[in-house]
Amino acid sequence: MSILTDFKNFISKGNVLGLGIAVIMGDAFNKIISSVTGDLLMPIIGAVFGGVDFSGFFIRLGAVPAGYTGSLTSYNDLKKAGVPLFGYGQFLTVVVNFVIVAFILFMIMKLAAKLQKELDKTEAKKEEKIAEAAPTPEDIVLLREIRDELRGKK
């Protein structure tokens, strides 16, 4: 086999294609979650806790340099000036994103499990109907009659 044929066989296998689709869907899902978090939930949480953008929340751990003329409330400006900062706001944003993603994935898993359970019940009912509806073959009926006759003679 040539390398091209081997590569074609490798790519055409279901696992590789499924993985590729999962990566693309994961990227799209990440964009949706980022939008839900950044555009919908974080403004509400920020309004409740007094700030719309958590990423700028920080605690100054050291002194501001003597010649500093920037804003004392700007995380980026203070960081560029070399002021030691404890920037917990971005961490809070990432934690909120994680909790939202975990909850949504949990709900998707619960829904998938419920749908699978219903599908299994439907399949079991179909199999029962098929088993009930299928006539017993004549040779089986004959063998049962012979068995019953032999039991009766004992």
From Swiss-Prot:
Belongs to which family? Belongs to the MscL family.
Q: Where in the cell is it found?
A: Cell inner membrane
Does the UniProt entry include the keyword Transport? yes
Record bears the keyword Chaperone: no
Organism of provenance: Zymomonas mobilis subsp. mobilis (strain ATCC 31821 / ZM4 / CP4)
Cite the InterPro entries for this sequence: MS_channel, MSC/AndL, MscL_channel
Task: Kindly state which keywords UniProt assigns to this record, in alphabetical order.
Answer: Cell inner membrane, Cell membrane, Ion channel, Ion transport, Membrane, Transmembrane, Transmembrane helix, Transport
Give the CC-aspect GO terms: plasma membrane
- The superkingdom listed in its UniProt entry is Bacteria
Give the record's membrane topology. Multi-pass membrane protein
Give the primary localization class: membrane
- Pfam families cross-referenced by the UniProt entry: MscL
Q: Name one GO molecular function term.
A: mechanosensitive monoatomic ion channel activity
Purpose:
Channel that opens in response to stretch forces in the membrane lipid bilayer. May participate in the regulation of osmotic pressure changes within the cell.
**Protein name, per record:** Large-conductance mechanosensitive channel
Specify the signal sequence span: none
What residue ranges are annotated as transmembrane? 16-36, 39-59, 89-109
How is this protein organized at the quaternary level? Answer: Homopentamer.
